[in-house]
């Protein structure tokens, strides 16, 4: 849900990106959720396989059912297709250009936010974030207290515990 509809477009836009896809020989499958940066409702995911032969390992079959054998290649069973229709409509509406535009906006804001956070001596951005999210914390101040204070002002964030951090997932308007 975090990288599948973000990292490929960031890579297209020329942002330095470690290999994460089928360019790595060891990657045989990629799961991509369509919510968050795919902008679809929850409940739709994709599974990309390097080789069609791998599909044989993604079947579910159950013989002990009164109606007979039940076999499916999806774990969704007989759920309705509303989320799927939503995802299709959003993808058709945005197209690659729409996703690229949103990723470009998010990356620009993320860069400014990281620069601003790094300008505060007591704060540290953890790692080298490549996606539209990042975490930051402090070894000098209680970052959870900072998060609580920001929440009172309407700024909500996720929290991480190892190391203690605030997690920001950015989005384009």
Regions found by a protein language model. Give the residues of each.
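Glycine-rich, often proline-containing surface loops adjacent to acidic residues and nearby aromatics
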Residues: 87, 166-167
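Active-site C-terminal subdomain of aminotransferase-like
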Residues: 8-132, 136-141
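PLP-dependent enzyme catalytic core of the Aspartate aminotransferase-like
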Residues: 169-173
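Short amphipathic alpha-helices in soluble, non-transmembrane regions
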Residues: 146-153
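Catalytic nucleophile loop
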Residues: 1-4
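A short linear hydrophobic-aromatic micro-motif
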Residues: 121-124, 155-159
């Amino acid at each position: 849900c975090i990288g599948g509809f973000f990292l490929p477009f960031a890579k297209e836009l020329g942002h330095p990106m470690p290999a994460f896809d089928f360019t790595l020989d060891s990657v045989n499958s990629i799961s991509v959720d369509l919510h968050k940066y795919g902008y679809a409702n929850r409940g739709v995911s994709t599974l990309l396989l390097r080789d069609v032969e791998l599909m044989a390992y993604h079947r579910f079959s159950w013989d002990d059912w009164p109606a007979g054998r039940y076999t499916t290649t999806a774990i969704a069973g007989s759920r309705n297709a509303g989320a799927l229709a939503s995802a299709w409509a959003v993808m058709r509406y945005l197209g690659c250009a729409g996703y690229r535009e949103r990723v470009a906006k998010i990356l620009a804001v993320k860069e400014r936010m990281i620069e601003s956070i790094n300008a505060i001596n007591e704060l540290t951005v953890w790692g080298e974030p490549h996606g539209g999210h990042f975490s930051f914390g402090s070894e000098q101040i209680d970052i959870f207290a900072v998060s609580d204070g920001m929440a009172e002002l309407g700024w909500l964030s996720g929290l991480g515990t190892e190391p203690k951090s605030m997690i920001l997932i950015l989005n384009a308007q």
